[in-house]
């Protein structure tokens, strides 16, 4: 590698060393956030965040949603790991299934709903810009 020290995050604690920045979401506390961004049900993220970035693995139970919101100072990338959800964005809507990625650019709005009978799980990355 290039000899610079990177960071490893395990359960939210940092250690210098290693070649990559690694997040072990299984060791992070799962939060339960009701009606996130005005949505319904419970948003359940395991999350790393600092002043530059939020990186999370999250779940939405059947019938739960993340409310419609605008990304004024950042963008968001959602990669669906399991299940199928519905993404509402600006003035459209599309199904998002496991293996697909949704990108909401800075200045745009979106929401994610779980209209299925199973829990959905996804990664989300929100870089500040």
What kind of feature is each model-predicted range?
Residues 51-52, 73, 92, 117-118:
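Short strand-connecting beta-turns/loops that link adjacent beta-strands
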Residues 91-106:
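Short acidic-glycine-tyrosine-enriched beta hairpin
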Residues 106-129:
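Ligand-binding loop in jelly-roll beta-barrel domains
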Residues 84-86, 93, 109, 119:
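Structural motif
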Residues 65-67, 86, 102, 106-112:
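Histidine-centered metal-chelating micro-motifs
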Residues 59-61, 72-86:
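Short, conserved beta-strand element in jelly-roll/cupin
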